[in-house]
Amino acid sequence: MVRIIPLKKNEAPEEVRTQIQAADDVFGIQSVSAGIQAYCPPILNASRALSAAPNESNQLSAELRSLVCMRAAQIVLCPFWIDSNAAGSSKSGSSDEKIAAVSAWRTSSIFSREEKAAFELVEAMTQTPADISEEVFSNLKLLFNNEQIVELVATIA
């Protein structure tokens, strides 16, 4: 339930209108979070910058970033982000079979070692409290360099 009515682009401060339009372009509809964050332009700008940073880093494939975001959305039960990231995964090259198997990644043979390690990290980061075991981190270090791990954590966060 939305308790703060999102600002429409024409109601928002001039300095954040391009940010709202960019968010709307990504989703194809008005972004509720961008419209709400527009009440406080520094928050909207920081949020958009953090969201864009992993895409600009390019240490990881767009497909892996979309898959881990989809898994995180599944864990927190967010239908909008599940659908949005499924579409992003499809655009970035994931097969329909792979997208459908994300929730059952542990028993699926369709995922690479890197993808499975990333899914382990997603699950560790989305528990309360977050608990990334030495085993999970050691496995990441075997498959990813430090830059990739930082990008992966930022993508999941």
Show which residues each predicted segment covers.
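Hydrophobic alpha-helical segments
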Residues: 1-157
